[in-house]
């Protein structure tokens, strides 16, 4: 099968399953808000060729532990319509704090319910944007362009921007507003999440970078939203009280 046929087959498969993505609604954002996400590199571009070579290099050097941890990261997501009583509700709440999980035992949904609600609402906005632009760009997965890539996960939707990268960086930038002294840790966790998708061959580096940029623009945009700022203030108060309780400066 030629490369054009492979691309069209993959796009057809993808379009058959995106219906639920197109029905997502944001929480804080207005649906008509535009973001400055750039077009992905063309499939035949020199950048895409270079990124495919990079992914092949990652494939040749990745260890079993790299794959194991990356496949674990693949399970870290938030189902935006989750609710108390759902069998995965506890896990979804835990996933909200995957970024920054190492900074303190109290940095979790159980200890910070208002912060957890804020993060969940931001994930709704991020999910809306992710699917909006995945549906718009319909970028082919790297392993569909180069069959020498042995992807460790099968994904039947578009690559650009990376959902894991967008969500993780959105968390990182949001948490940096709440706990700026830990910003380096948050950004490192988000980078590791984004890079894990490259390690297992399902995302180009430009997918990760577009997700980072989209997340940064999202948080900056939300800082102009009065409802978000009100919820952010409540989360800051909640976190400050817990820091005082645990003897943090």
Named regions from a protein language model:
Residues 6-200, 221-227, 231, 248:
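Hydrophobic alpha-helical bundle signature of multipass membrane enzymes
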Residues 216-218:
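Catalytic phosphate/nucleotide-handling subdomain of diverse soluble enzymes
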Residues 234-249:
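Primarily interfacial, aromatic-capped hydrophobic alpha-helices that serve as membrane anchors
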Residues 203-206:
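Short acidic/histidine-rich active-site segments
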